[in-house]
UniProtKB/Swiss-Prot annotation:
Reactions catalysed: 5,6-dimethylbenzimidazole + nicotinate beta-D-ribonucleotide = alpha-ribazole 5'-phosphate + nicotinate + H(+)
Pathway assignment: Nucleoside biosynthesis; alpha-ribazole biosynthesis; alpha-ribazole from 5,6-dimethylbenzimidazole: step 1/2
A biological process from GO: cobalamin biosynthetic process
SUPFAM superfamilies found in the cross-reference section: Nicotinate mononucleotide:5,6-dimethylbenzimidazole phosphoribosyltransferase (CobT)
Stated name of the protein: Nicotinate-nucleotide--dimethylbenzimidazole phosphoribosyltransferase
Gene: cobT
Keyword Transferase in record: yes
Length: 345
């Protein structure tokens, strides 16, 4: 298993603080940009941090839990949206082009035969997971295969920033079950509308999650993150866990998107707590439970925009702020270089 080292470095942290504080501005006046500059500097081990060739991987897979009527959309939307990604017509395509972010699309386990397709990375573990209301979503072997596939994909990314996106009808239910199993919070605090369920649908979804977590109580009680992942997760979530671990091992900046991506991070952080040093929480989703997830992980979201689309859209929308953070650190004048007087003692 991968070992992720903490970015903590007292000497470099002091150098970064001095560099930031000596820019031509009042102390702390760039707010969260200063926090990001320090974090990225510690990740990259330099006071001259930069963003190089950012990339985002969208992982798609289907979920057996849809048999419990937990989504407002049919399962076929998963493969139809993959086709939309490949055609360049989804929101993530638009935002990735706008922000010069390389986009990779992965079939992690969609219930559809795509054949050989340009632009689609075939890592299909199976044609969707099993129904975790009745049995574990995947076998331990399938879970390990998916995690390893994610690691291998992240190993091949060229840049130093990696974001994660997902597509899978039913995956907010899987993420909510992971959240409840990991935090022991009531299902009502973990379950939201997903793709747009009405109030009665949300109540039904809460019961499905509550009952499923209770059904697998013996597994949940062990608090073993990979067992929880195999029991409730999707193949896309498992691949994201692996990709996160490998990206952090490579000292990349990890852009964390919404509810499903953060559920994967909960698993990864239980395996390797230092991974959180590498994570930028791009936004706080409107999906119920995401704020609690972020708080549980000690994170602070960059954006608050009411997003709940997924696909990695929030991560790519936060990219300009990462550029701004490293650019002011490298390019902004100091009081000395600009011959500007500092504040009175």
């Amino acid at each position: 298993m991968i070992t992720i080292v903490s970015t903590e470095n007292d000497a470099l942290s002091a150098q970064l603080a001095a560099a930031i504080n000596n820019k031509t501005k009042p102390l702390g006046s760039l707010g969260m940009l200063e926090t990001l500059a320090r974090q990225i500097g510690l990740i990259q081990q330099t006071t001259q941090a930069q963003i190089i060739d950012p990339a985002l991987i969208v992982f798609a897979a289907d979920h057996g839990i849809v048999a419990e009527n937990v989504s407002a959309y049919p399962q076929s939307v998963t493969w139809q949206m993959v086709e939309n990604f490949l055609a360049g017509g989804a929101a993530i395509n638009v935002f990735a082009r706008q922000n010069h972010c390389a986009l990779h699309i992965v079939d992690a386990g969609v219930n559809h035969d795509f054949g050989r397709r340009e632009g689609l990375l075939d890592r299909k573990v199976a044609y969707g997971t099993r129904n975790f209301a009745q049995e574990t979503a995947m076998s331990a072997e399938q879970c390990a295969q998916a995690v390893q596939a994610g690691m291998d994909l992240a190993a091949g990314i060229k840049g130093n920033v990696l974001g994660f996106g997902e597509m899978g009808i039913g995956n907010t239910t899987a993420a909510a079950a992971i959240m409840q199993a990991m935090t022991k919070l009531p299902a009502a605090e973990c379950v939201g509308a997903g793709t747009g369920l009405a109030h009665e649908g949300i109540l039904h979804k809460q019961k499905v999650v509550q009952d499923a977590v209770a059904y697998h109580a013996a597994i949940v009680a062990k608090n073993a993150p990979l067992d929880i992942l195999a029991t409730f997760g999707g193949f896309e979530i498992a691949m994201i866990v692996g990709a996160m671990l490998k990206a952090a091992e490579r000292r990349m900046v990890l852009l964390i998107d919404g509810f499903i991506i953060t559920s994967a991070l909960m698993i990864a952080a239980r395996l390797q707590p230092s991974i959180l040093d590498y994570c930028v929480f791009a936004h706080c989703s409107d999906e119920h439970g995401h704020r609690q997830m972020i708080s549980h992980l000690g994170g602070r979201p960059v954006l608050q925009m009411g997003l709940r689309l997924g696909e990695g859209t929030g991560s790519v929308l936060a990219l300009p702020l990462l550029h701004a953070a490293v650019n002011f650190l490298r390019e902004m004048a100091t009081f000395e270089s600009a011959d500007v007087s500092q504040q009175n003692a």
